[in-house]
């Protein structure tokens, strides 16, 4: 019983972490550059229809 609660909590934590890590939806990298610069990052790329920001301070 305790093990199943631990597994459920672990899955719930993973779902929250992946949801917070995802960027905005995109169709091309130029959209992400503007979005990432507003967040304080130097560059951004569109990967799997989601913005990924790089070189953040």
UniProtKB/Swiss-Prot annotation:
GO terms for molecular function: ion channel inhibitor activity; potassium channel regulator activity; toxin activity. Disulfide bonds join 26-46, 32-51, 36-53, 41-56. It is found in: Secreted. Expressed by the venom gland. Transmembrane segments: none annotated. Coiled coil: none annotated. GO terms for cellular component: extracellular region. The record marks 45 as: Basic residue of the functional dyad. The keyword Disulfide bond applies. Residues 1-23 form the signal peptide. Pfam families: Toxin_2. The keyword Transmembrane does not apply. The record marks 45 as: Key residue for immunosuppressive and anti-inflammatory activities. Keywords: Disulfide bond, Ion channel impairing toxin, Neurotoxin, Potassium channel impairing toxin, Secreted, Signal, Toxin. Has the structural arrangement of an alpha-helix connected to antiparallel beta-sheets by disulfide bonds (CS-alpha/beta). Belongs to the short scorpion toxin superfamily. Potassium channel inhibitor family. Alpha-KTx 23 subfamily. Negative results: recombinant toxin does not cause hemolysis in human erythrocytes. This is Potassium channel toxin alpha-KTx 23.3. It comes from Scorpiops tibetanus.
């Amino acid at each position: 019983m305790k093990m199943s609660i631990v597994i459920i909590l672990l899955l719930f934590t993973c779902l929250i972490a992946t949801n917070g890590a995802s960027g905005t939806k995109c169709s091309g990298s130029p959209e992400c550059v503007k979005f990432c610069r507003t967040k304080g990052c130097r560059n951004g790329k569109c990967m799997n229809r989601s913005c990924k920001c790089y070189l953040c301070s």
